[in-house]
Amino acid sequence: MRLRNKPWAEEMITNHPEVIVPNPEDFKGNWQVVFGNNNPIHIEVGTGKGQFVTGMALQNPDINYIGIELYDSVIVCALEKVLEAKSPANLRLLKVNGADLNKFFNKNDVARVYLNFSDPWPKTRHAKRRLTHGDFLKLYESILVDNGEIHFKTDNRGLFEFSLISISEYGMLLKYVSLDLHANMPEDNVMTEYEQKFSAKGQPIYRLESQFITKL
């Protein structure tokens, strides 16, 4: 995603603590204080402009959603999307690095992780930066409930194949795999901005659902 400087972004972010949680490390292990309930929490790492996480929150009011995004110029777009949707009570955003999730969540805080159209980092020497690399899977496992899930969508065949191998080698269960999601699209599918763009061009969308297996 090309980042365009938005000089007004920082002020807008500061003015909406009801959406973009300040000092999220203070709620580690205690997110029910933020949401006012004990409903399961699903997070999207790399929430981009927020279309997916906002749509999911509106579609599933009994699940709490948190969108993770690092850059001011991007998260402010997600903030605008949330405000347009009248700030659903079950949705928050965090302006943090997705590599630091265990600074903000304890084990069992999160039920599901969504990864949508992540940077493919195509060069071999950058493989560890891919969000489905084993190091990231270990990070997700450290905050997820037992048998927690990862749902992943991409238009990049190479990244998808890498992810299938990485997830399998980690010992996770592959519950669902699609090489063309839109050929038989689930009724409850919520599209991201990238998904709309690529599918309109006829590019296949790859999707998988995977689950950690509780180690005895």
UniProtKB/Swiss-Prot annotation:
PANTHER family: 3-DEOXY-D-MANNO-OCTULOSONIC-ACID TRANSFERASE/TRNA GUANINE-N 7 - -METHYLTRANSFERASE (PTHR23417), PENTACOTRIPEPTIDE-REPEAT REGION OF PRORP DOMAIN-CONTAINING PROTEIN (PTHR23417:SF14). This is tRNA (guanine-N(7)-)-methyltransferase. Signal peptide: none annotated. S-adenosyl-L-methionine binds at residues 44, 69, 97, 119. Gene3D superfamilies: Vaccinia Virus protein VP39. Its EC number is 2.1.1.33. Pathway: tRNA modification; N(7)-methylguanine-tRNA biosynthesis. It catalyses: guanosine(46) in tRNA + S-adenosyl-L-methionine = N(7)-methylguanosine(46) in tRNA + S-adenosyl-L-homocysteine. One of its GO terms (molecular function) is tRNA (guanine(46)-N7)-methyltransferase activity. One of its GO terms (cellular component) is tRNA methyltransferase complex. Pfam families: Methyltransf_4. It is an enzyme of class 2 (transferase). Substrate binds at residues 123, 155, 192-195. The active site is at residue 119. Keywords: Methyltransferase, S-adenosyl-L-methionine, Transferase, tRNA processing. Catalyzes the formation of N(7)-methylguanine at position 46 (m7G46) in tRNA. It comes from the Bacteria. Belongs to the class I-like SAM-binding methyltransferase superfamily. TrmB family.
